[in-house]
From Swiss-Prot:
GO terms for MF: aldehyde-lyase activity
Record organism: Synechocystis sp. (strain ATCC 27184 / PCC 6803 / Kazusa)
HAMAP family: Phosphoketolase (MF_01403)
Keywords from the UniProt entry: Lyase, Thiamine pyrophosphate
The protein's name: Probable phosphoketolase
Enzyme class: lyase
Amino acid sequence: MVTSPFSLSPFGQARSTVTGNPLDPTELNQMHGFWRAANYLAVGMIYLRDNPLLREPLQPEQIKHRLLGHWGSSPGISFLYTHLNRIIRKFDQDMLYMVGPGHGAPGFLGPCYLEGSYSRFFAECSEDEDGMKRFFKQFSFPGGIGSHCTPETPGSIHEGGELGYCLSHAYGAAFDNPNLIVVGLAGDGESETGPLATSWHSNKFINPIRDGAVLPVLHLNGYKINNPSVLSRISHEELKALFEGYGYTPYFVEGSDPESMHQAMAATLDHCVSEIHQIQQEARSTGIAVRPRWPMVVMRTPKGWTGPDYVDGHKVEGFWRSHQVPMGGMHENPAHLQQLEAWMRSYKPEELFDEQGTLKPGFKAIAPEGDKRLGSTPYANGGLLRRGLKMPDFRQYGIDVDQPGTIEAPNTAPLGVFLRDVMANNMTNFRLFGPDENSSNKLHAVYEVSKKFWIAEYLEEDQDGGELSPDGRVMEMLSEHTLEGWLEAYLLTGRHGFFATYESFAHVITSMVNQHAKWLDICRHLNWRADISSLNILMTSTVWRQDHNGFTHQDPGFLDVILNKSPDVVRIYLPPDVNSLLSVADHCLQSKNYINIIVCDKQAHLQYQDMTSAIRNCTKGVDIWEWASNDAGTEPDVVMAAAGDIPTKEALAATAMLRQFFPNLRIRFVSVIDLLKLQPESEHPHGLSDRDFDSLFTTDKPIIFNFHAYPWLIHRLTYRRTNHGNLHVRGYKEKGNINTPMDLAIQNQIDRFSLAIDVIDRLPQLRVAGAHIKEMLKDMQIDCTNYAYEHGIDMPEIVNWRWPL
C-alpha cells in the first residue's frame, strides 16, 4: 500500500501535489525577506504605537493599551500575497486578491504597505520610520482604520468581516474581465458557511472565452476562534474528492518549513496559472466554450505561523489560541513584553529595512510596479474602469393610458423589453441576475438578445424553451447569496447589473445587502474611491399576490431592514404602474453609489398614468393625483394616500365609493413612489420639508395611508411630522394563508371597504350620518369573503373594477 505524503498536520517540510524548485537562491531570499517583513508589520500593527523598528528595547509605553486584531490568518494571507507578486511579474498578469478571512487584514495591509501602494493613497503613512509608526498606530485604533479589509484598504473590494462571500465576489469580479485572474482565499472556517459552500459551484458559470478566471485557494489553518475547522479534520482523500466533485482539480501545498514551502507554492502557482492560460487559449482560439476543470489550491499551514510556539505553557502556533492576539498584558507582564520583543526580532528587521525605515530594494524588487500591484490595481477601484450604460429611451417602452385606471397590463413585462435593449446596447458590461425567476417575473424578453448562461451538460429537451446558452448574460442560480455576491463584485469592478427576486425571499440576502451598504457608506468619505454603479434590486411577486403560495411567501419586511442603513446610500421606490416603473428603472440604472430597492408586482394591474404624468410623479416622489381628487382650491376633509400597486388600487376604489356615497366629501389623493420623501429633509436627502409635507398632507385632517408593507414603517418615517397624530396606516399585518387577493386584503385591512369605513370613523360629520353606508360596507366584506370561500376566486365586480369615468 502506498502511503500518502499528505497529513492533517500543518507542520514540517512542504508536501505538495506539484513538485519542483523554481526559485533560485536569490529569488528565494527575496521572497522570504518580503514575507518576513510582512509578518513583522502584521505584529507591529496589532501591538505597537511607537518604536516601530525596535531601534531600542521595547518599553510598555510603546505598546497599545487595547490590543485588537487577528494574527492567526495573517501569515498565510501575506504568504500568498508574496507569491502572487511573483506570478504577476512572471506572467505580466492582471490579478485581484480577495481575502475571505478579512479579519486577517494585517496580512494584507503589510504587503500593501511594503509594495508602496498604501503610501500612494495615504501619504501620511510614508515608507519610512515615521510613516511606519503611523501605520502601526492607526490599525484598530480610534480615529484610525478597522481590523478587516475595509474600504480604506487599497486593493480590496471584499471586507471579509461577515464570512461567506469571498468566492461569489471573486467570480463576479472575473465576469467579462478576460485578462484578469482573481485569487480568492477562502478560510476553512468561512467554508462552513452556507453562502461559501454554494459559491464553489460558480465555476459552472465562467466562460473561458469572454471571462477571466478564478483561482480559489482554501486556507486550511485548522482552527476558528476556539474550535477546529471541519475541512481541516477530514482525510486528504475525502477533501480531494470533495473538490473534484465540485468540478475542480485540487492542488495541495502543506507544511511549515519556510524554504520548502516557498518552493512548493511557487511551483504550484506556476502550474495553476499556466493551466488557466492553456484553458483560455484553447477556448479563445477555437471559439468553443466548454466547461473545464479549473485548478484550485488547498494551502495547509499552521494558524499563527511563525508566531510564538507557546505562551505561558499553552500551545499557540498551530492552535486556536493564535486566532486573535496571541498574548496580552504587556503593561503588567514583563515576560510577555520580552516574548513579544523576541518574536518581532525573530524576523530580523535590521536586515529588511534601511536606516530610514524603508524596505530594502532587494526585497521590494519582487513586487510589481504601478497599477500591476495588488494594492493599486484599478480592478479594486472599479469606478476608474466604469463606462456609463448606453441607454435606450425608456419612454419608448411605455403604454398608452388615455384614461386613468381603465386598462390593465402586467407591470414588469414592459420592463423586461426595456432591459432587453439595455442588454443589447451593453453586451460587455451589463448582466441580469435572478434566482430561477426571471421568466416567472415576466422579464423573459431579455432572452431575445441573451440567454441564461449555461455551460454544463445539455439535454435535447432544453431546446424547447430552456433559453440556455454558453454565452448568455442572464445569470440564474437558485442561490440568492451567490447571485448577490456576483452582482456586488461585478459592480465593484466597474460594471452594471440588475437583480430581480421574489419579495419575501429578498430576506435571504438581507445581511449581504447590509454589508454592501456599509461599504458604500465608507467609500463616500474616501476621495480616491471612484464612483460605482448602484445596486439595483427589483422585488416582485409581492406579498399581495402571494395569495396562492401562502403565508411563507408573504413578507414585505425587507424594507424595514434596509431603512436602517445610511440615508446617503439607501433609496426605496414603489411605482404603481408600468410607466412609473420604467421611469424608476431608468433612473436607478444610471445612478451611482446607491442601493435602489424597487417594489412592483409582476401581474396584470390597473394603469393610472401616461408617461408624462409618470415621469412627473417619479421626479417629485410624492404627488397629488388630480383626477382622483375633488378638493382643488379648497381644504380637503381627508387625505387618502397610497404607496404600492395593490394598495393604490384599493385606495382608489375606496375613494370612488366615498365620492359616490358622500358627494360633498372633499378627498385629496396622494401617490407616494419615493418612500423616503416621507422623512424630514434633516434625516434624508430626499425628505420633504415640513412646509411641503404639511401642504400635501395638511396639519390637522385625517390621513388614511394604504401601504404596501408593514404599517409601522410609515409611522417610523413620519413620527416627527406635524400631523402624525392624525396619520392612520394600513398595511400587511401577518394575516394570510391561501387566499384570494381580496380576501388577503380584507384580512389585513388594506381593502377598499376597510379604508372607506376608516374615513367614516375618522370624520365627525360622517360618524352618525354614514352609519348606513358603514354597515353596507361591512356586508360587502362578508359577501366577498363568502364568495371567495365558495368559488375560490374573487367576485367579478372586484376583479373587473375600474376607475369610474
